[in-house]
């Protein structure tokens, strides 16, 4: 079963920034040499609700894909790259994800293709990932929509977890969010909402050179975020259901 893992690393202050920047370069070779890592991206993050062009220098991420859950858990726990990042960070949260559906590409490939496309159960949490490469001359149109979307994100009490990450500030963006169920996710993402209007405008006006949309089931979490694991109870509910 293919599995994706999102590893988030939070640093206190900016004193670790030179080390982080160096690792954005130095981590690539050992990741390229690890056969169990089928895909990876090293990413920064955004401030505020996460979906902003202003970088958050304290939060960084590794998005990776594996052939099995066992590989995902072993690599993120024991590989030297993850161990180095974890040792330097003040806090680490790793989320393991089972792909349910994925369309589009990221860097020319779709790393999250499931063995079989599936819909999440009506009452289980759903993880949504959207990745877009923005055309430079469309960046203003894209980012002009973001404040209203971020405002709604901050107000939505249904949202369980959220973060915006990206490979290249302004132009390569990833939104990652977790919802209690698919109905609540669709209520935010579609229809006559700021997000729904932005999606329609993106398609009509051709904002992106590349897009990927994926849904996942939350398999498990490791570590903490802001002093706790914000998703542990949801994983426990799934395992005991």
Curated annotation (Swiss-Prot):
Keywords: Carotenoid biosynthesis, Heme, Iron, Metal-binding, Monooxygenase, Oxidoreductase
Iron in keyword set: yes
Broad enzyme group: oxidoreductase
EC number: 1.14.15.9
Reaction equation(s) it catalyzes: spheroidene + 4 reduced [2Fe-2S]-[ferredoxin] + 2 O2 + 4 H(+) = spheroiden-2-one + 4 oxidized [2Fe-2S]-[ferredoxin] + 3 H2O; spirilloxanthin + 4 reduced [2Fe-2S]-[ferredoxin] + 2 O2 + 4 H(+) = 2-oxospirilloxanthin + 4 oxidized [2Fe-2S]-[ferredoxin] + 3 H2O; 2-oxospirilloxanthin + 4 reduced [2Fe-2S]-[ferredoxin] + 2 O2 + 4 H(+) = 2,2'-dioxospirilloxanthin + 4 oxidized [2Fe-2S]-[ferredoxin] + 3 H2O; spheroidene + 2 reduced [2Fe-2S]-[ferredoxin] + O2 + 2 H(+) = 2-hydroxyspheroidene + 2 oxidized [2Fe-2S]-[ferredoxin] + H2O
Pathway assigned to this chain's UniProt record: Carotenoid biosynthesis; spheroidene biosynthesis
InterPro entries: CrtA-like
Cofactor(s), names only, from the UniProt record: heme
GO molecular function: metal ion binding; spheroidene monooxygenase activity
GO biological process: carotenoid biosynthetic process
Protein's UniProt keywords contain Oxidoreductase: yes
Cofactor details (free text): Binds 1 heme per subunit.
Function of the molecule: Involved in the biosynthesis of the carotenoid spheroidene.
Protein family: Belongs to the CrtA family.
The protein, known as: Spheroidene monooxygenase
Annotated organism of origin: Rhodobacter capsulatus (strain ATCC BAA-309 / NBRC 16581 / SB1003)
UniProt gene name: crtA
